Amino acid sequence: MKQRTYIAIDLKSFYASVECRERGLDPLDTNLVVADESRTDKTICLAVTPSLKSYGISGRGRLFEVKQRVKEANAGRQHDAPGHRLEGSSYLFSVLQENPSLAIDFIIAPPRMAYYMEYSTRIYQVYMKYVAPEDIIVYSIDEVFMDVTDYLNTYKLSPHDLAMKIILDVLRRDWHQPLSLQSGDGYCRQAHTGR
């Protein structure tokens, strides 16, 4: 039996990344959580941006847990701030890193499932430029596996290089979607790319 080569593409914090992109924000620098705040603070967060996760927030926690963790992180920032005072706030990670006197803030984006499906479909269309639909296994709205065994010779590329070519095509479309990928034939190699 011929050994098969697969590429796995996982759209990092997909719902949160889409919400950032739609606001003209960098998903790797924006504190944002996708949650239906109208349902109470016990609602489950559907996605959390990587920068917000860096404060110890779970990707699938409840909204009250996000608020509590941010409150705790702000208490630490206040303790360390000049004069033990926080003046203003920001939801941008880079701004918070530059100014320890600012409180951590974050955006709560209500979920828009139909829109995420549409967005995912547009990205899937990019995948189909390189791989036939019958060789793409859709695992979820934000994750696919591609059997690229028969395409490597055609494109004269390694699995990693083909994966990067596909990812760069997605990024070139100005979607600024952070992606993580795994590719290999018996091994996995990870690469991360942002904007």
Give the location of each predicted region.
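Gly/Gly-Pro- and Ser/Thr-rich, intrinsically disordered tail segments characteristic of DNA damage-repair
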Residues: M1-R195
